[in-house]
């Protein structure tokens, strides 16, 4: 039914434990779910072997050594067994409700993107625990993307893990597909972590040279879409038009005022 693909960080220390937990949740979704781990980070091959995921070590990188989004999507296109895809950050725990949401949206539309807020929670002990203890991360924190093959034929060479590429994915889908905010129906648990894997830390990931390059590749601030730009919402298993026009107006004002510092 679904091919999940992700580009993990090295499976070391605390982030390694976080990623093992996320990976286990994906492979637990059943035999109809194919899981692809992309890139040659330390521990990725062993993690894939232990969980039954597939490991694809070859992945193009930026000049600074960061995995590229276009390469990840191309690898998924070449290897995926299912036309329904999910690109997800490697620290996010998923549950069966994601599959339910995908089925319901796919039954009503052939071209779509499903996104939604994740919840910040450490060591979630199941969906209900994540929902009870988690804190919503906001409309701009995008960690999973569910879509049918063919939606992203031309992906720029974004640096994964830097600002702006996730917002562009929403903008691109919005051009000729419906974008569904599934926050009300899907619980996705984002586990807290540091930015030790990025030289310069979180500031570099969001405001550094590769973030600035991502903004350029995206086509500027006007294309930094968030959940406020979704055309539809999924609530109680039913699709509705997104009533959040005032929120979209406020979001455009926020984006216009945003400054991206380059160091």
Model-derived features: positions:
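Short, hydrophobic beta-strand segments that form beta-sheet elements in well-ordered domains
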Residues: 33-40, 114-116
């Amino acid at each position: 039914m679904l091919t999940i693909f992700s580009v993990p960080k090295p499976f070391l220390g605390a982030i390694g434990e976080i990623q093992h937990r996320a990976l286990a949740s994906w492979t637990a979704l059943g035999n109809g779910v194919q899981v692809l781990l992309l890139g040659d980070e330390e521990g990725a091959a062993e993690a894939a072997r232990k969980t039954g995921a597939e490991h694809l070590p070859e992945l193009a990188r930026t000049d600074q050594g960061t995995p590229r989004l276009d390469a990840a999507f191309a690898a998924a296109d070449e290897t995926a067994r299912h036309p329904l895809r999910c690109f997800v950050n490697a620290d996010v725990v998923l549950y069966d409700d994601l599959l339910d949401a995908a089925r319901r949206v796919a039954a009503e539309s052939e071209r779509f993107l499903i996104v939604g807020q994740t919840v910040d929670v450490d060591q979630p002990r199941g969906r209900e625990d994540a929902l009870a203890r988690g804190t919503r991360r906001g409309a701009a924190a995008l960690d999973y993307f569910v879509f049918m093959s063919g939606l992203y034929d031309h992906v720029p060479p974004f640096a994964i893990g830097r600002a702006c590429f996730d917002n562009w994915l929403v903008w691109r889908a919005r051009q000729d597909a419906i974008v569904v905010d599934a926050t009300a129906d899907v619980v996705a648990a984002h586990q807290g972590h540091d930015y030790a894997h990025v030289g310069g830390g979180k500031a570099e990931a969001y405001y550094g040279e590769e973030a600035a390059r991502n903004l350029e590749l995206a086509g500027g601030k006007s294309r930094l879409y968030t959940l406020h730009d979704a055309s539809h919402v999924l609530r109680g298993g039913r699709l509705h038009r997104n009533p959040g026009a005032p929120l979209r107006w406020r979001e455009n004002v926020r984006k216009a005022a945003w400054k991206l510092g380059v160091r």
